[in-house]
Design a protein with these regions (language model features):
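Core catalytic region of metal-dependent phosphoesterases/phosphodiesterases
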Residues: 1-62
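Extracytoplasmic/secreted envelope proteins and their assembly/folding machinery
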Residues: 16-20, 96, 173
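Conserved beta-sheet core of the metallophosphoesterase superfamily
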Residues: 22-32, 38, 48, 112-203, ...
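General small-molecule cofactor/ligand-binding pocket signal
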Residues: 53-55, 69, 150
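Residues that act as N-cap/strand-start positions at coil-to-secondary-structure junctions
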Residues: 54-55, 107-109, 170
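Conserved hydrophobic/aromatic beta-strand scaffold that supports enzyme active sites
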Residues: 60, 68-70, 173-175
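His/acidic metal-ligating clusters that form di-metal
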Residues: 64-148
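Actinobacteria-biased recognition of intrinsically disordered, low-complexity terminal regions
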Residues: 202-221
């Protein structure tokens, strides 16, 4: 099973449909949620791939022996007429709130929940055992209230945006090892490649989920 938390394209144009054509040539299920750079055209192109599992709503879907749930990002930022760049945090959090409600109502709880923006994961903390996100172009992993949140870096190296900074954006992916019966995270490998023009490659293995992070305490006064 391959999991992709979105932003498969830069501008979400129909010309970029071919970016997802390679998905159909893989011989494993490909679970995907829409990112804020992915348009409805891109989502439709992904749905046309025979092995794609497009998650965009409250339904629990089974793939590769795992129960999955996910929701696409509420924004489409390349179209500046939408003013989605200025969308308030509540719009992003609402994605997770809808998933949290569906999670609570599901008879068979999903073992893996996908969102694009880590902010959308907040309402899922304390519910789902494992939540995967993207968007930040930076790898972050933490456990809070029993939920492990894994934010993936840029598996595609951020496209042409990788050239905007002095150093190229590294290519990052994570291989998860899940219990065959429970779907619980047992270990994971973090792979990092140097990015455009950089031949550096690193891999590190982590055993078990990361240590729990205490929930912030309310301030007094």
């Amino acid at each position: 099973l391959v999991v992709d938390t979105g932003d498969s394209t830069d501008h979400g144009t129909a010309v970029e449909d071919y970016y997802v054509d390679g998905v159909g040539r893989l011989d494993v299920p490909y679970a995907w949620v829409r990112g804020n750079h992915d348009s409805s055209d891109i989502q439709a192109a992904m749905r046309r791939q025979p092995n794609a599992v497009v998650l965009d709503g409250p339904d629990v879907v089974e793939a590769a022996g795992l129960r999955l749930m996910g929701q696409g990002d509420a924004r489409f930022t390349p179209d500046k007429t939408t003013r989605d760049d200025d969308a308030p945090t509540e719009v992003i959090t609402a994605v997770g709130s809808a998933l949290a409600e569906a999670y609570d109502e599901a008879a068979d709880k999903p073992q893996l929940v996908l969102v694009h923006d880590p902010i959308s994961a907040r309402p899922l903390l304390g519910r789902a055992p494992l939540v995967l996100a993207g968007h930040a172009h930076e790898r972050r992993v933490r456990t809070e209230d029993g939920t492990t949140l894994m934010v993936q870096g840029s598996t595609g190296g951020a496209g042409l945006r990788a050239l905007e900074d002095e150093e190229p954006t590294p290519v990052m992916l994570t291989v998860l090892y899940l219990d065959a019966e429970t779907g619980r995270l047992q270990a994971y490998d973090e792979l990092t490649l140097g990015g455009l023009g950089d031949t550096d490659a690193r891999i590190s293995r982590r055993i078990g989920p990361p240590p729990s992070t205490p929930s912030p305490s309310p301030s007094g006064g």
